[in-house]
Amino acid sequence: VGNSIKLKPRYYRWHVDPGVEWVEKNTGYANLNWDIPLSQVALVSVDVWDRHYITDTEARGEQVIQEKILPLIAACRKGGLEIIHAPAPGRNLAQSNPAYVNLVTSEEVNAGRDKEWPPQEFRGKSGQYEAYARPVEPRDKERADRVADLVMHPQVQPEGDEVVVAFGEDLHRYCKSKGILFLIYMGFNTNACILLRDYGTVEMSKRGYEIIMLRDCTTGMESFETHDDLWQTRGAILFLEMFGKYSIKSDELMAAL
């Protein structure tokens, strides 16, 4: 096991070269050369579930897990790269896991939120605000039943000293205690939890961490318009690369270990 890893993280230059017209088609990708102390890096596994209620989303995710995530996890364990598991807190899956770090209370997590405004009725679209609610989906109970006993993927479980976090503040306090500055992300879904969780790429970038997305260790929630070319997935990764974050592929990380 080496003391550092050499990576060439990719980003998107919203710039043009000297002498070139300022138009979008003249912008493009670029790479940096980083030599990162191994002790300052962690792999964050976001919401790697055992299923999804949309069948093709589930199939893509399972293929990513089997072909990309599992080999990467094995390489990281062998190479000494820390792995942090971040399942969603909603079902208490993180909090009930024996590996949960338990560094923050739910009261602390909610402390900064204004509970009075917007009013609870407005948030819940009830009472005088009921007219603004989306219609009830006729198959929503069926959807809920399909994921009622959702769990962390059986092949992507914490081992040894690997920890589980439930909240962004958990992740931050743990990283602070370990001196971790670089967070490499994998998991699901690219355009949802990877972007929007408080332990996800955007919020942890706001806290000052360097963020690297593993672009072949994820897939997004596609629409009928984006499904064929996976433009939700690709667009979410490009969003990160355009706005201060980076990406690599799993084989690059494995080769660096």
List each language-model region with its residue ranges:
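Active-/binding-site microenvironments in catalytic and ligand-binding cores
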Residues: 83
